[in-house]
Amino acid sequence: MRLGSRILLQYSTPSVSSSLVPAILDLAERTCMSPDPRNLIPTAGSQLGLAMVINAFDGDEIICDCATYPGALAAFASAGVETTGVASDEEGLNPDALAHAVAEGRANGRRIAAVYTTPTFQNPTGSVQSENRRAALLKVCADNDLLLIEDDPYGMLSFDGQTWPALKSMDPQRVIYLGTFSKVFAPGVRSGWIDPPANLVEKLRAVCEIMTLSPSALNQAIIGEYHRRHGWDELLEGYRASYRARARLLIGALEAELARTNCTGTWTWREPRGGFYLWLENVASTS
């Protein structure tokens, strides 16, 4: 209540509160972004942000990784938008496969709304796009005049603290960036943001107002006050250490179970560098 209950418990506007802006800018700078605070749109997490984005634009189809976040597929389906999954490798979405899918879709008369990807510690494969891969994907989008939706819930969760430049930092006027505090603060607070190209701000803000009416000013104030007092470094390092330990525990359990069942060599995986996911592949068939 000391944060200002007379204001925080009232209706709000579809703009990020001034108290939350420093917390967002602190995270954004770590992946080479410099958002304009006036363009930031509040969400109740990136899932709602994704639903807002897909409901704001026309199109029949979203192109994404062949294995992708199930919540994204649900959001696209709820908006009546079909998805086309394209081939991925250890660096995530393949640029040549993306270009082929775009050409094929347009040849068949489909209107492609956007490309969707999680470039850092992707769900579910855990892949990380190199800087060269990111540049190549953005070139395909630029060559075909396509928007790209960047979903970035795990970008701060590298086990060794490494970060990569956000796609948004490399092409600010083509990328719609979805951020969330669910993975770096607490999922129960339900707070995130959209950083869209400048020419799409008002359209997305109108959708935000329709879908949420009043983003939680109280939740934004809680996060903003935490950041004002503590910053992000200590909390992020705690999360990284926790997930690093969990990954080691999981890999140890897998190795022990495969040895116990004489299945060593049947399954392979890449050592995760961060995020939540470990992707297993069967030597005979991918699973």
Model regions: which residues?
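Conserved core of the PLP fold type I
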Residues: 2-144, 149, 155-176, 243
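Surface-exposed helix-capping loop/turn segments at secondary-structure junctions
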Residues: 30-34, 234, 254-269
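All-alpha amphipathic helical-bundle segments outside canonical DNA-binding/catalytic cores
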Residues: 36-41, 268-272, 285-287
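Short beta-strand segments
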Residues: 64, 116-119, 149-152, 179, ...
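Conserved glycine-rich beta-strand-loop-beta hairpin in the small C-terminal domain of fold type I
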Residues: 68, 240-251, 263-282
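Feature representing long, continuous alpha-helical segments
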Residues: 96, 100, 135, 202, ...
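Conserved core segment of the aminotransferase class I/II
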Residues: 105, 169-241
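Conserved C-terminal alpha-helix-loop-beta "cap" of PLP-dependent enzymes
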Residues: 201, 205, 277-287
